[in-house]
Amino acid sequence: MSLETLLQAALFLEWQAQQQQQRTREENDKILVEQEEEEEEEEEEENKSVLRTEEHINQLPPDPVAPPAPAPPPPPPPPPPPSAPVTVIPLPVVSCTPQPVVQTTVSPPVLQRHAPVVSPPVLNKEVSLPPVIQRPPSTVLPEIKTTPLNMGSPKPLHHYQAPVLAITHHHLMQQQQQQPIQPQPTSLQPQQQPHPQPLGALRLPVTDDGRSNEQRRRPGGAGTREVHNKLEKNRRAHLKECFETLKRNIPNVDDKKTSNLSVLRSALRYIQSLKRKEKEYEHEMERLAREKIATQQRLADLKNDLSQWMDIIEIDRIVRQTVQPEDDQASTSTASEGEDNIDEDMDDDRPVNALSKRQQPGLIKMIPSSAAVHNHHSTILPQHVSIQQKQVPSPHTQPQISSQALVPTQAMVPAQTHIVTASAVQSTVIAHTATTHASVIQTLNHVISGPQTKHIAHIAPSTSSPVQLTTAAQPIGHITVHPATINHMTHLGQQLPIYPQPVAVSQPMMSHIAHTISHPQVNGTTNLGQPAVMTKPTVGTQMVHHPQLVGQTVLNPVTMVTMPSFPVSTLKLA
């Protein structure tokens, strides 16, 4: 369970509890309102019942008084003596009775009424005649009846005391009505003693009405209580289910008896721990995002560096392809380094050189230099040239070697092969490849120019047109080829590239064209895809070993042939 779900569950529980409380409050309010309404209705009913009882009581007195009502018919005979002072005596009695009724409250008029009612008959008995005594009570009684009825009608009878007083008042009125009938005034005291008895008799029905109202309330109250209990039971069951679900969602909570308070506390602790973990995870995500951005920037920088390095490597590769001679010259910056390499080659090939020394007396001179002068304009170097050279241990096989080295057909030489010429005057020849720039050649011309005669053979960049190879006018006496160099050339044939393009060479005073010049102490290295044959159609190859010639042939890019007399330390190609 996630934090949000727990919070939502807690909020849902609180919301349900609030709704349940509101419902219970509303129900309680309704119950109270109903109870109040019932009480008001009961009070109204009680008031109505009291009024009814009062009306009933008011209606009851005329029945016992009704028999004396026919008494007035006998008074008509006395009217003949009007001159008697009968009329003067009842006036004060009538005038005295209404004044205390207006000034006093409900309770005192009872006592005051007793006094005037009691006093006038005494006066009447003392002063007036017996017939006169009977008339004033008849006149006084209706007045007394009217006053209490007028007094009792406007009162709002909310309490139980008021009707009791009214009832007592009515009883007093009845007693007063009975008093004038009796001729003795002393009968008031025995009549006042039974007064409390009718009060108790009247109170009993009022209490019976209250008990009946209470009995009527109980069924309604019991029904509302049952409904309330049912709702409370449902609410508690729902809360119990909610606490059970909360307990299941919280880890590390004992399944034993646990109170709801402990469950809520553990839930709060769990929520707080989840909040802390959430904050930690947020910080971790921010840190990882920063690291990701940093690694992306570093990766972009590395890609930029790699692209730059790739560009540099590509440029170097293109430069090497286009300007390989300059790189090779830079690698062989001085001729002295070349001489060191030559010395190493000499150490490796000493037995071959020893074998070649044995074959020096048996070398065959082929064609004189006059033949080379005659055919110097028609020399063509085809693409494919083969040289078959074998090492013979004994001098008896020298004719076979010379015959194998001679081929009457056209000489096939690769187009980019470096052609090296040497003169008898110990001249130096540097042959450059087709990719060499003119600036390098000019530098070589300036550097190599000296007192001695030196020859530079340059082959122009490879094109479809033939390129002329020119040398100095001084004739070259002979070109020597050592048989050990042929084997060395075949070993290096698979390592250096071959440029099979035809090149035409014109040499006015050139007697022989050779691919390698070897010395007993030096091995010249050259690269040929196929063995080269040292012959031309009209020019033979003179294989004479020259003891003082030191030569090195490099196919690509520079071939340097140095003589001991040339200051090689001054030559440096950049």
From Swiss-Prot:
Pfam families: HLH. Residues 174-194 have a biased composition (Low complexity). Residues 17-84, 171-233, 323-353 are annotated as: Disordered. GO terms for molecular function: DNA-binding transcription factor activity, RNA polymerase II-specific; protein dimerization activity; RNA polymerase II cis-regulatory region sequence-specific DNA binding. Residues 274-302 are annotated as: Leucine-zipper. Residues 34-46, 337-348 have a biased composition (Acidic residues). The keyword Iron does not apply. Residues 223-274 form the bHLH domain. PROSITE patterns: BHLH. It is found in: Nucleus. SMART domains: HLH. SUPFAM superfamilies: Formin homology 2 domain (FH2 domain) (SSF101447), HLH, helix-loop-helix DNA-binding domain (SSF47459). Keywords: DNA-binding, Nucleus, Repressor, Transcription, Transcription regulation. Residues 23-33, 47-57, 206-217 have a biased composition (Basic and acidic residues). GO terms for cellular component: nucleus. Residues 61-84 have a biased composition (Pro residues). GO terms for biological process: regulation of transcription by RNA polymerase II. Transmembrane segments: none annotated. Expression in the CNS is localized anteriorly and in addition is present in the migrating neural crest cells. InterPro entries: bHLH_dom, HLH_DNA-bd_sf. Efficient DNA binding requires dimerization with another bHLH protein. Binds DNA as a homodimer or a heterodimer with MAX. Binds DNA as a heterodimer with MAX and represses transcription. Binds to the canonical E box sequence 5'-CACGTG-3' and, with higher affinity, to 5'-CACGCG-3'. This is Max-binding protein MNT. It comes from Xenopus laevis. The gene is mnt.
